[in-house]
Amino acid sequence: EDVCMILGDNIFHGNGINQLLVNAVKNVKKSKKAKVFGYYVNDPKRYGVLSFDDNKNVKSIEEKPLHPKSNYAVVGLYFYPNSVVKIAKGILPSKRGELEITSINNIYLKNNQLNVEFLGSGFTWLDTGTPDSLLEASNFMQAIEKRQGLKVACIEEIVFNKGYINYKQLNNLAQNLSSSEY
């Protein structure tokens, strides 16, 4: 089986995110290449950072560099063919003493088996790995919910809209939550 991995402290939001994910799965299945996503950030030192050659092709990915070569970070969403299992078993700890996902991505890059897609202005990526970034993400989600009057990522609504549960099941789930703001 192919593999999708998302870092637990990452939040993605934007119109078309579902189709982006479906397309990534199809791309990996068809090409047998890994797929990652790049995103422009103001503080690239916190992330795996993409560097480019003169033709704007990805040249390398460096984890949390002191001197970033670009402002494009690799977000915490990765799609891999099943070959990642074998590759991951061979990864050694980095200079920071950690097993880095960037090491895996660089192996795919070196073997010309890494596709990078850049998330545009219609998408938001939030890494909540620091107290400040967690607060920022909370405020962002709160602003969306208050302005639109809709909750973001209600799992019950999502599974109902996808046809995984019927109206009666949705109603039963909602009854348990009726006294909460959710």
Identify the function of each model-found stretch.
Residues 4, 25-26, 57-157, 168-169:
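Catalytic-core segments of class I nucleotidyltransferases/pyrophosphorylases
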Residues 165, 169-182:
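Short, amphipathic C-terminal "tail helix"
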Residues 16-17, 69-77, 177-182:
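Short flexible/disordered coil segments
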Residues 45-49, 125-129, 162:
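Short, solvent-exposed polar/charged micro-motifs at secondary-structure junctions
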Residues 1-54, 79-82, 87-91:
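Conserved beta-loop-beta/alpha segment of the NTase-like Rossmann-fold superfamily
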